[in-house]
Amino acid sequence: MKRQSERDSSPSGRGSSSSAKRPREREREAEAGGRRAAHKASGGAKHPVPARARDKPRGSGSGGGGHRDGRGTGDANHRASSGRSSGSGAGGGGRGGKASGDPGASGMSPRASPLPPPPPPPGAEPACPGSSAAAPEYKTLLISSLSPALPAEHLEDRLFHQFKRFGEISLRLSHTPELGRVAYVNFRHPQDAREARQHALARQLLLYDRPLKVEPVYLRGGGGSSRRSSSSSAAASTPPPGPPAPADPLGYLPLHGGYQYKQRSLSPVAAPPLREPRARHAAAAFALDAAAAAAVGLSRERALDYYGLYDDRGRPYGYPAVCEEDLMPEDDQRATRNLFIGNLDHSVSEVELRRAFEKYGIIEEVVIKRPARGQGGAYAFLKFQNLDMAHRAKVAMSGRVIGRNPIKIGYGKANPTTRLWVGGLGPNTSLAALAREFDRFGSIRTIDHVKGDSFAYIQYESLDAAQAACAKMRGFPLGGPDRRLRVDFAKAEETRYPQQYQPSPLPVHYELLTDGYTRHRNLDADLVRDRTPPHLLYSDRDRTFLEGDWTSPSKSSDRRNSLEGYSRSVRSRSGERWGADGDRGLPKPWEERRKRRSLSSDRGRTTHSPYEERSRTKGSGQQSERGSDRTPERSRKENHSSEGTKESSSNSLSNSRHGAEERGHHHHHHEAADSSHGKKARDSERNHRTTEAEPKPLEEPKHETKKLKNLSEYAQTLQLGWNGLLVLKNSCFPTSMHILEGDQGVISSLLKDHTSGSKLTQLKIAQRLRLDQPKLDEVTRRIKQGSPNGYAVLLATQATPSGLGTEGMPTVEPGLQRRLLRNLVSYLKQKQAAGVISLPVGGSKGRDGTGMLYAFPPCDFSQQYLQSALRTLGKLEEEHMVIVIVRDTA
């Protein structure tokens, strides 16, 4: 009855009832109305908030029962305050006040939020919600709209090459229910991530004609659960509601609905009705700002826990996340280049581990331990070349499934040496700065650093000094406030080719930051991941994306120091190293190979050179004499023997003619070329000249091919360079080496005992060189530097007791097992490496008279020196090696 009488009362009575309220209650009502208005503007929960019992009699209006629905039930106080300012208690006025913000309408100072900031210009970075300072930082980019049909490795390589130009990155693939296949690109510095995103906004990225979507993943400002920033972007899937948590200062869109990310709830149902004390005004302000951001198209910006990405993304769906913070190498004192890989299958092989991890860096050693059944799973230790490679592999592969189990990765124990690897250097770091900071721990022997590189090698005289420097200098700021050093131990016996600190040339450096080997031929452009080639934005319709020329670290260092004025192609796997060597006084074998390449490069073209036309016009009878193995392609290749060595396999008619024209030994070749004789006359003339050029009883290549049945017989036709034992660990391999090209004096001067001066009979392989293109280029550069009398190339075959030149074969020392050479070749093939021996054995007192020996198994690099044998025998089935001996230049 009391409520009915109040409903029938006059407007004056309603006004007097409202004016009789206490000031404290009016303030509470205005505060609640502002909170509801902000929550509705941000797309928040529309849950009914029950009015206080003592306020019900005062909430009268002329709207009748229509204002007692779900919307009007929680707005009694709001309508009361609105009625005081407007002079009427209409429900429509109450709703209008709710939409426009009641604190201002009631004459009170607004306590919810200032007006939203103006929208940023197109392409600019969005401002942090609720902050007037700089934009929020992010180090991770989310790449979506990826094709589900592309192989994972191929997709990773393409994305890696696109984004690595902006800085040091790590990349992982994942799959989400909402976006499908996605990729996360992590940058070390926020400015690198921002630059990459701005580049993606300016130029549309395509992957096989499919536009990619690039979005930032913001660093988290605080923990908690999330809500939508606008009601218009509600998700289709809603996860189970989580426990209530404090409101986060950022209002943003979460990324994945069904994943176990440490994110806030997708649905407003799970959020409390904004009744947390003291923090509600800030939450409302941030909600308003988030709504304004959504109005200008920023609702797709995401904010996830940054470290949660390292643990969760790319993990198989359904595996629990490991809540573990991944420290950077400069902050983690336990970080080393050795990784422990746990929870492996007992059947896992070294090949599987290398295939999974080698994309992140050079793996020097793999050790797999398989405990007995019932005593735990298998585990392994992987030794990378440096700390950056190990950390990149640890971050990227943690939780990945190898075999049937998700693996666990941690750092192994360090192997202290006197040599340190120092990473994280700035582009302006100098040798003087490195020496000044590191010499306080002890005497420094060498510093290997190229200005502009991000790493250096420092060798101490004592192990204690190296250990002290490694412990104290990790995390030391050098080169700027945003750069801190990453220090770890490196192989003490390896040395880079010196650039400034040491004047004399040293053996080829083994510390190139390479990633990708000859085993994966389609990943040749992925050789150097820490050194970014200046690729343009790739187009996936361009099939040469992975075949483009760029400069590797070894080549860039050579160019910076002006050691040689030449350029090389990183894709070259044979003698394709220099474009204009004729004016440098190189020996004729190099010129011949260069000219042979220029001829062979015309294969498959519609236009043919006169040389090819002459080859096609030869008679059918002559073609039958050559046999089926003498193809036109082989006939166009040239014999690349040295000037003083006449090889019996150069009886190919076209090759003899072309080789004679290059050397200029027979002037009547030009007369025969200009003669008007017919085809038969020219063929007979060439046969006659071939016989004159090679004073051997064999007149037809067919007879010679039948005589030389294998590579050992072919080697007997060459000059013997050395015979003895190659030693690897506890095995020795009797070997005979015959000279393919080069100087005999290099062999006699370097392959001798330094103490007694006698000829060496045993060579021990102590190091390995990975068959990576930058390292092969470095070997070729050293060969070029040693020309014409500073190198030798030999063919190594199995030495037989009855073979020619094996009468001086030494006896096997006790403790060594005699094995066939094919076992050594198989070992090097499996390791994808070449054997390395420092010459002379035992060291040298001075800098003169030193060199290196490289023992290459059959590979693309070694095949360039066996073209003559390949033409003669057709195919090389016998196991062999190509030995390259290079003398160091002063």
Swiss-Prot record:
Region (Interaction with Epstein-Barr virus BMLF1): 722-890
Glycyl lysine isopeptide (Lys-Gly) (interchain with G-Cter in SUMO2), cross-linked positions: 213, 702
Tissue: Ubiquitously expressed.
One Gene Ontology CC term in the entry: nucleoplasm
Gly residues composition-biased segments: 86-99
Short motif Nuclear localization signal, span: 593-597
Biased composition range(s): Pro residues: 113-124, 238-247
GO biological process: dosage compensation by inactivation of X chromosome; mRNA export from nucleus; mRNA processing; regulation of alternative mRNA splicing, via spliceosome; RNA methylation; RNA splicing
Biological role: RNA-binding protein that acts as a key regulator of N6-methyladenosine (m6A) methylation of RNAs, thereby regulating different processes, such as alternative splicing of mRNAs and X chromosome inactivation mediated by Xist RNA. Associated component of the WMM complex, a complex that mediates N6-methyladenosine (m6A) methylation of RNAs, a modification that plays a role in the efficiency of mRNA splicing and RNA processing. Plays a key role in m6A methylation, possibly by binding target RNAs and recruiting the WMM complex.
The protein, known as: Putative RNA-binding protein 15B
Source organism (scientific name): Homo sapiens
